[in-house]
Structure formats: structure tokens, C-alpha cells
């Protein structure tokens, strides 16, 4: 009888081990990659803000031809984890707030550095305006108005819209695209 009990215990251990071994077999797998960039700046740029895509959808050719402008789309640049302690300085006895301004670069439309030329032979252009409605220039040198910063997260607001370019040609059907780059300057 003792042999039967020992044999039963051994059999149970083997079955139990087999069940546990089967449960630990991977039933799916994946990979997580991590990346980033350390910058010498008071703020980081949120990933979604660093590379954005704005889709204007389908736009009526006749609407643009008659001087229409699409509904503005938000173009927000979110700055994260800002530490503006070193930006604040005494200037004339008063504390100066930390600020940021931007420059935009791209291919300006013909005779208009405040319009971004599109690619695609549609004779359209993109206009970007700051929060006060002032058009930004795509010359890579003209700074936008300075925005005050706080410690933590900050969002710089712009809008973008499409209109007929200044080429004098009729708006044509087809797909278009454009790329603008921005640079930050902290003060």
C-alpha cells in the first residue's frame, strides 16, 4: 500500500509539473523599443508636436479660385517638462519672464514669404497664423512673437489654412502637400 501511495504521489507530481510547464509556454510575444533625444534646452517638444500632419481633406476648386480660404486647422506645438529657472533674469531691476519664439522655414510661395508653396501643381499655398492672427514667414529667420513660458507644460497655438497662391494661375485639381520646419529660440 505504501508503494501505491508513493507511486500515486510521484504520478501527481509529474502531472502537476507538466501542467505548470505547459502554462509557461509563451502564447504570443512582442517587442517594445524605447528612443528619445536629450536636448540642451529649457523644454522638450512633445512627440506628436515634433512631427505633425494636418489633413485639409477635399477642398472645392471653385471655392479657392474665387479667393476662399479653408477653415483654419489647429497647429499646436506642445512644450513639455519646461524648467525656465535659468531663463528668468533681472533686467533693469525687474524679473524677466522666460519666453520662446519660433522661426518657420520651407519653400515660400512666389512673391509671398508668408505663404508656404504646395507641391502638386494645384496652385495653392498654406498660410500659418499665430494666436493673434499674424501670418508667420517661411524664411527661416523671422521670429514669431514671444510666448511667455511657465515651469511644466506649455502649448504654443497656431492655425493653418489653404488658399490660392499668388502665381496668377487658376487653381487646378489634384493632391497637394507641403513641409515646414520650425526652430525654437528661448530667452
Curated annotation (Swiss-Prot):
Give a short account of what the protein does: Fimbriae (also called pili), polar filaments radiating from the surface of the bacterium to a length of 0.5-1.5 micrometers and numbering 100-300 per cell, enable bacteria to colonize the epithelium of specific host organs.
Might you report a single GO cellular component term? pilus
- Disulfide bond positions: 43-82
Entry keyword annotation includes Lipid metabolism: no
Please list every transmembrane segment annotated in the UniProt record, as residue ranges. none
User: Record's superkingdom?
Assistant: Bacteria
Write out the entry's keywords from A to Z.
Disulfide bond, Fimbrium, Signal
Q: What InterPro entries is this protein classified in? A: Adhesion_dom_fimbrial, Adhesion_dom_fimbrial_sf, Adhesion_dom_sf, Bact_Fimbrial_Adh_Pro
Q: Where does the UniProt annotation locate this protein?
A: Fimbrium
The entry's family comment says: Belongs to the fimbrial protein family.
Q: What protein is this chain from?
A: KS71A fimbrillin
In the UniProt record, the signal sequence range is 1-21
Q: Specify the species.
A: Escherichia coli
The alphabetized list of GO BP terms reads: cell adhesion involved in single-species biofilm formation
